[in-house]
């Protein structure tokens, strides 16, 4: 299922939240509306953690994570780290990373199997990513942009990349990741798909400005509604067959 939301008038959902198959992080905000969108879809399925990182709310841009682990920058306080450890499942590894490129969400794009990272990340950081997240790591650019986490959104089912990514690059990335990819946008034409969207294997949350066309692309490439925990999204299968009959 794909839903639209706003964080205090901002459509950049991926800046203020992080979503994986085993937990969700949501920034602390003045209004509960944003949190309630996640709560409505994820309550009783995975824990949703109200968090700050280094005293800021841009938690989606400062962290990188998947089902197995969460990476946070060294500026994360001990108190914040303890809060994450208390809220997230026990089998999720949480690790601070000492890295010059500290906005980890901008420079790391990953699912539960593969990570694409900024070409200039430290060698040690690469090893920590492989170890904590349990993924294969590739240094990569997306449409000549080094910020892989900003210009790509990825789940275990599929991915969306910067709209100007060439077909050749899409094919290369797709065979590397072993998932289908599509070049697309969010929030009425924004190329920064990583910042405008969070996704796991059964749910995507994107900005309120995202058009119906963009939303349908998101639902189809991420195969949302085909599978979900405890039957979430089973009703969407009917909608898919109706949509197919139009073409």
Curated annotation (Swiss-Prot):
GO terms for MF: ribosomal large subunit binding; translation initiation factor activity
UniProt entry tagged with the keyword Lyase: no
Modification sites for Phosphoserine: 174-175
GO biological process, any: assembly of large subunit precursor of preribosome
GO CC, alphabetical: cytosol; nucleolus; nucleus; preribosome, large subunit precursor
Keywords assigned by UniProt, alphabetized: Cytoplasm, Initiation factor, Nucleus, Phosphoprotein, Protein biosynthesis, Ribosome biogenesis
PTM characteristics: Phosphorylation at Ser-174 and Ser-175 promotes nuclear export.
Compartmental location: Cytoplasm; Nucleus, Nucleolus
HAMAP family listed in its UniProt record: eIF_6 (MF_00032)
Stated role: Binds to the 60S ribosomal subunit and prevents its association with the 40S ribosomal subunit to form the 80S initiation complex in the cytoplasm. Is also involved in ribosome biogenesis. Associates with pre-60S subunits in the nucleus and is involved in its nuclear export.
Subunit text: Monomer. Associates with the 60S ribosomal subunit.
Family, per entry: Belongs to the eIF-6 family.
Listed name of the protein: Eukaryotic translation initiation factor 6
Lineage: Eukaryota, Fungi, Dikarya, Ascomycota, Pezizomycotina
């Amino acid at each position: 299922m794909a839903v639209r939301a706003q964080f205090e008038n901002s459509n950049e959902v991926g800046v203020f939240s992080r979503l994986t198959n085993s937990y969700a992080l949501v920034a602390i905000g003045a209004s509960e509306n944003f949190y309630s969108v996640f709560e409505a879809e994820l309550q009783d399925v995975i824990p949703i953690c109200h968090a700050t990182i280094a005293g800021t709310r841009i938690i989606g841009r400062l962290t990188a994570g998947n089902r197995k682990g969460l990476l946070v920058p060294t500026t994360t306080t001990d108190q914040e780290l303890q809060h994450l450890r208390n809220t997230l499942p026990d089998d999720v590894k949480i690790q601070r990373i000492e890295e010059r490129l500290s906005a980890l969400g901008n420079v790391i794009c990953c699912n539960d199997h593969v990570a694409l990272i900024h070409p200039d990340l430290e060698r040690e950081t690469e090893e920590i990513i492989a170890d904590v997240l349990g993924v294969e790591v590739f240094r990569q650019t997306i449409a000549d942009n080094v910020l892989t986490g900003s210009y790509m959104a990825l789940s275990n089912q599929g991915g969306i990349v910067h709209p100007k990514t060439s077909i050749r690059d899409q094919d290369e990335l797709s065979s590397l990741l072993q998932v289908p990819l599509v070049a697309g946008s969010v929030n009425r034409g924004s190329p920064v798909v990583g910042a405008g969207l969070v996704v796991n294997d059964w749910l995507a949350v994107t900005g309120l400005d995202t058009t119906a066309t963009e939303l349908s692309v998101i639902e189809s490439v991420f195969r949302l509604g085909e599978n979900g925990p405890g039957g979430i999204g089973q009703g969407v299968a009917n909608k898919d067959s109706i949509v197919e009959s139009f073409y």
